[in-house]
């Protein structure tokens, strides 16, 4: 067990690094998460100041909490009309990116690496097309994209994680039983999305109405977080996408004028909404800082197979880039965000979902699961580096425009 003073010292250093990295991002366009991941690698794999094995059991919970808070914050900054206008294109993007990427990476693992199809499909679903909300939400805000592009990135990051998880669980079932059903996977995705959205809409409508009566009380923000956690749990219990439900919750809270129209009365919560947004921004920043350092801490880099890992990780990343390029070209065709197409192709950072699924694969006793973690590490590093390069050039382009 780590000494509390040591833990507090590390936490203080992480917060200082996160603040400096954020200011550096605003000046240079180089994302802060790169520096934070590197800080984690130094604290973990390089110096062994913090044990990776201590942190692995916490990954799922910490990742879920971070994604929940980041998506809620992202939803609070989305215009409802823009969301409805772009949701169809985002769905096309996710389908054309996640499914082909998963299958091509699985084929690569089977034919090139010689893995069996069950393991290859499981691995493909782990790295096949996630774009992590922990990167996309703050990055889309920091780069000052037009709103339609920002909505596209945030919504894509929420939806592709759901696709990845469902495909992963489908292929786990294939490994355990020897059978898999495409119908089951498709119906699970439709059901997951629908239930999550309906629960998010219903509970957020209720809560926005309640806020009109409790807005003058102290600790309203904490109470809102409690209801957000309840929304997440309820959506999950009923088989819906908990992440989509909290995203919808944030969107409805931000667009409370829609609720006023629905209820046919004024709620007068504009001041409260601004205060909630500011508090949520601070909390999201803190969680993002720790989760990126966390990712650096748990990466698995072995000097014995580093060249193999770099080669295979690079080839997988190349597959992702090619498929993403084609998917973005189709999904943005003749749209208002087509001008940002080249940047969208490069914003492919992976993080929380593949890292969590790779750890879950170990828990399921999947052969090669330890190899999964190593390769996932390289894919995370490569995709985040490409995203850093893409955001750097995007920042230069947007500042010049």
Regions found by a protein language model. Name each.
Residues 1-401:
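Transmembrane helical cores of multi-pass secondary ion antiporters/exchangers
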């Amino acid at each position: 067990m780590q000494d509390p003073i040591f833990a507090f010292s590390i936490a203080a250093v992480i917060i200082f690094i996160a603040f400096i990295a954020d200011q550096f991002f605003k000046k240079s366009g180089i994302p802060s998460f790169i520096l934070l991941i590197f800080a984690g690698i130094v604290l973990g794999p390089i110096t062994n100041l913090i044990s990776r094995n201590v942190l692995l059991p916490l990954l799922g919970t910490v990742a879920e909490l971070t994604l929940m808070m980041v998506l809620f914050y992202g939803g609070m900054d989305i215009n409802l009309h823009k969301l409805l206008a772009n949701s169809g294109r985002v769905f096309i993007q996710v389908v054309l990116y996640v499914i082909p990427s998963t299958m091509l990476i699985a084929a690569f693992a089977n034919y090139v690496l010689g893995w069996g199809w069950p393991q290859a499909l499981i691995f493909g679903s782990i790295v096949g097309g996630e774009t992590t909300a922990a990167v996309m939400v703050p990055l889309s805000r920091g780069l000052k994209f037009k709103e339609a592009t920002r909505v596209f990135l945030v919504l894509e990051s929420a939806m592709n994680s759901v696709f990845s998880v469902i495909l992963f669980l489908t292929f786990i079932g294939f490994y355990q039983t020897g059978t898999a059903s495409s119908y089951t996977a498709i119906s699970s995705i439709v059901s997951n999305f629908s239930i999550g959205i309906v629960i998010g809409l219903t509970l957020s409508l209720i809560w926005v109405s309640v806020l009109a009566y409790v807005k003058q009380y102290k600790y309203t923000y904490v109470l809102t977080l409690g209801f957000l956690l309840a929304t997440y749990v309820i959506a999950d219990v009923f088989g819906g996408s908990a992440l989509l439900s909290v995203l919808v919750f944030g969107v409805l809270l931000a667009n409370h004028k829609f609720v006023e129209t629905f209820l046919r009365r004024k709620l007068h919560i504009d001041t409260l909404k601004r205060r909630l947004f500011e508090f949520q921004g601070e909390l999201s920043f803190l969680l993002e800082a720790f989760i990126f350092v966390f990712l650096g801490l748990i990466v698995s880099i072995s000097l014995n197979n580093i060249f193999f890992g770099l080669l295979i990780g690079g080839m997988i990343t190349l597959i992702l880039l090619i498929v993403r390029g084609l998917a973005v070209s189709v999904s943005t065709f003749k749209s208002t965000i087509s001008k940002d197409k080249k940047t969208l192709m490069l914003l492919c950072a992976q993080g929380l979902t593949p890292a969590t699924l790779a750890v879950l694969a170990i828990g399921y006793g999947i052969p090669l699961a330890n190899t999964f973690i190593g390769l996932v590490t390289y894919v995370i590093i490569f995709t985040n580096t490409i995203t850093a390069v893409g955001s750097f050039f995007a920042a230069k382009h947007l500042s010049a425009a």
